[in-house]
Amino acid sequence: LSQSTHLMANDRETVETAIAGDIIGIYNHGQLHIGDTLTEGERLGFTGIPYFAPELFRAARSKDPFKAKQLHKGLKELGEEGAIQVFEDELGNLYLGAVGPLQFEIVAQRLATEYKVDAIYENTPVSTARWLTYPDEKTKKEFETEQTLRLAKDADGNPVYLATSIYNLQTTQKHWPEVGFHTTREH
């Protein structure tokens, strides 16, 4: 963990050693997530931090088509940070999920300042999301074939069902009782 930084108020100091309770900053390129535990070889098991199914959704696209890669990169990194939940369907459409409207404003501001991307946020027919688990590969393949237009992946590549309404979700759950539809996902 080279270049770890001890954080105290406005002070920053490079440190070689940290002990339990120290708050340090670690330069990260997507390998570490909020709540990860670092040890020197011990195998520890903790319950993860839950991600909750978002309640608000927007579709995002760049105003400048030449900045689509920056938009994808920015949203992926912000999703990894936990600033917002990002879902991508098979066609490459990006859906942002939040528990409050302020999250969209923060993401828009950060995309503009940190990634130089001016994005358009549009209403979307998505009203709720559920993480999916399957009992076997056969069920997974059949479900994905039938529900292709409602499926996406989250920032970590986990399968997600994007329902257009609670009725749509309940109908799909009745039709597919063996598929697990989860309101939370453990990180």
Where are these regions (language model features)?
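A common structural junction motif
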Residues: E42-F46, L78-A83, L111-I120
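Helix N-cap motif at beta-to-alpha junctions
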Residues: G30-Q31, P65, A98-E105, I166-L169
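Short glycine-/aliphatic-rich beta-strand segments at the starts of folded cytosolic domains
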Residues: P50-D64, E122, S127, W131
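Conserved nucleotide-binding/hydrolysis modules and their immediate coupling elements
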Residues: L1-F57, K69-K73, E80, E90-N93, ...
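Charge-rich, low-aromatic oligomerization/scaffolding segments with amphipathic character
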Residues: D36-T39, L102-K116, T171-K174, T184
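C-terminal interaction appendages of subunits in large macromolecular complexes
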Residues: T124-H187
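Short, contiguous, well-ordered secondary-structure segments
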Residues: F66-F87, A98, I106-A112
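Conserved structured catalytic cores and adjacent interaction surfaces
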Residues: E88-E137, T148
